[in-house]
Amino acid sequence: YNSISVREKGSADNVEKLTGKRPEVHLDPTFMLTADEWRKIQSPVNYEDGKYILLYCLEPSKKQMQMASAISKKLNLPIVVLRYNNKNDWFNPFVHRYDAGPTDFLSYIDHAALVLSSSFHGTAFSLIYHKPFYVFNGMTDNRINSILYGIGLQERSIESIDDIDKVNLEQVDGKRIEDYLKNERKRSAQYLKEAI
């Protein structure tokens, strides 16, 4: 191949170990569109704007649900959880949405007061929409880790119930996010142009 790129530093390390060549690291395609471009396809949400915490975890643990519950109590906001296949009892105090599709997912993030997630895409869209957010165990996921360190928001990772004290509804630094994404979009687009 003439050109190989990956989405995070961890993958670049692995490719280099296997091939002896260092691939370039570029943005995940999710970040190539702006918030306004994503809003054009999101659906309306039938829930109070800005008056809920969105919880989106692909494989939620009991510990994460306990942390989410503690955050809900601290901030006095209900939790809306997007669920697809998990039927665990510890979800009971939350508002459940089983039928949310991709365009609903975007809207729920955009209209939340706070996003709690363990997923890359939950984190990515929180950044794109400049939403206050926290990531469960974000430093253990290569893609999440790469983007948080790139922007300088690694403090948005929460690992245990002891981290609940730092959770708040303060806005993330939208300018810092946009400056980073604008630069990386330009770099990624230039790479694609040259590679094709």
Where are these regions (language model features)?
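Active-site anion-handling motifs in enzyme catalytic cores
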Residues: 1-196
